[in-house]
């Protein structure tokens, strides 16, 4: 993939969240603020495109051009109903 495009990982999961990481090209990465997480408006402003619900949840200090995202895994409808 060209170095001048935003790259998106496949999604990966645990029991509470789905995750993905986004790799920013160098010209975009230099625009990100240091030492804090980005709001949805900020990462969308950088050109990151994802569906609703994703949150920038952690900094990867060795590689600050990699943004780490997660969102809650929706509960299956069957587990929402209470059957006594």
Swiss-Prot record:
What job does the chain carry out? Binds to the catalytic subunit of the cyclin dependent kinases and is essential for their biological function.
The record's PROSITE patterns line, in alphabetical order, gives:
CKS_1, CKS_2
Mind telling me which InterPro entries this protein's record contains?
Cyclin-dep_kinase_reg-sub (IPR000789), Cyclin-dep_kinase_reg-sub_sf (IPR036858)
List the GO biological process terms.
cell division
Say yes or no: keyword Nucleotide-binding present: no
What SUPFAM superfamilies does the record tag this protein with? Cell cycle regulatory proteins
Name recorded for this polypeptide: Probable cyclin-dependent kinases regulatory subunit
Pfam families in UniProt: CKS
Could you describe the subunit structure of this protein? Monomer in solution; may form a homohexamer that can probably bind six kinase subunits.
Provide the alphabetized UniProt keywords.
Cell cycle, Cell division
Q: Can you tell me which family this protein belongs to?
A: Belongs to the CKS family.
Any single GO molecular-function term of the entry would be: cyclin-dependent protein serine/threonine kinase regulator activity
